């Protein structure tokens, strides 16, 4: 499925030094998708940065035939956001 990144999200992604390729990976091959606020979904993938486990969370909405990225951020609080099956 195609995706679009809204301008504010792209600005935040760049400010946070998150590679666009990581955002694409999270959307196309998420390790987990969880429910977010207001019907949004959050695609999640774990990355290792400087030996530290980090969780990339990409918040998106599905509109017609594409995913629209609202924001994305990295967090070290993997256990807080990761949902156990």
PLM feature spans:
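Ribonuclease/tRNase effector modules and their secretory precursors
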Residues: 1-85
